[in-house]
Amino acid sequence: MDFNQSPLLVIWEVTQACDLACVHCRASAQSRRDNRELSLDEGRQLLEEIKSFGDPMMVFTGGDPLKRPDIFDLLRHSVKVGLRTNVTPSATPLLTPAAISHFQDCGISRMAISLDGPDAPTHDSFRGVRGTFDTAESER
């Protein structure tokens, strides 16, 4: 393995906060933000350092990135420094048409939402909250 190569992909778990209770969650999701999360200024500095590695794809994930009030500032800065920027929000009531418009306005390359089953009972059981299948489907 050549550790002098630049990363192709950087995934930043910007928060552990999330309103879902997914059975597979690796983020140890909780309802509130952790006070150890990077500040907006620290996040901007991190993005600049990541860009100095080369041209990796940057993915903002969580928890739910929409639980961070400054997520759109971080996304805009990521695009501004020249990173190919993606976001993976949770399918919760925070994922509104206005939020999706804000993502577009930030200039992100891609947004992904998970579907964890062919129907609402399967998906919602996996996500731990009723109604998330319908939210995800409505944003197609």
Residues of each region from the PLM?
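Conserved alpha-helical substructure of the radical SAM core
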Residues: 1-110
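A generic "binding-loop/recognition-motif" signal
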Residues: 18, 118-119
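Alpha-helical elements of the RecA-like P-loop NTPase motor core of helicases
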Residues: 23, 97, 121-124, 134
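A short acidic, helix-capping loop that chelates divalent metal ions and anchors anionic groups
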Residues: 29-33, 119-127
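Histidine-centered beta-alpha loop that forms part of the nucleotide-sugar donor binding/catalytic region
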Residues: 90-92, 115-118
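Glycine-rich S-adenosyl-L-methionine
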Residues: 128-140
